Amino acid sequence: MDIEEIKRQKMMELQQQQAQGAPNPEEIQQQQEQERAAYEAQKKQIMKKILSEEARHRLSNIKMVKPEFAEQVEMQLIQLAQSGRLPIPVSDEYFKTLLDQLYTMGSAKKKRDIKFVRK
C-alpha cells in the first residue's frame, strides 16, 4: 500500500463514521483503555510463559527504572519466542546476556562524541 491509498482508505472510514454518527470521545477513550488493558494482560501472560521467575523479577525492576527499554525488551522477547529462537523458559543468566546485547545495541546508536575546537 502506498501513502495515497492509505489516505483514501482513511478518508472513506471517516466519512462512514460521520454518516453513521461518530461515537463520542468518552466512548472512544474507554474503548482504547480496554484495548490497552487487554494488550497488557496478554503481554503479561506471554511473559509468564517465556521467562523464569528470576528473569520476570529482573524485568519488573527494569520496568520501574527504564519503562521504554523494558517495553523494547518485551517486544524483542515476544518476537524471538514466536520465531522459535528462544529457549523457553528463559533463565536469568540467558536473560542477562540478552539485556546486555540489547543495551549495547541501543547505546551504540545514542553515543555521541563531543569535540572541543580550540583556537
From Swiss-Prot:
Q: Which cysteines link up through disulfide bonds?
A: none
Q: Which GO terms describe its molecular function?
A: DNA binding
Pfam families listed in its UniProt record: dsDNA_bind
**Nucleotidyltransferase as UniProt keyword:** no
Q: Where is the composition biased (Basic and acidic residues)?
A: 1-11
Under the heading Gene3D superfamilies, the entry gives: PDCD5-like
Name assigned to this protein: DNA-binding protein Maeo_0998
Q: Where does this protein come from, organism-wise?
A: Methanococcus aeolicus (strain ATCC BAA-1280 / DSM 17508 / OCM 812 / Nankai-3)
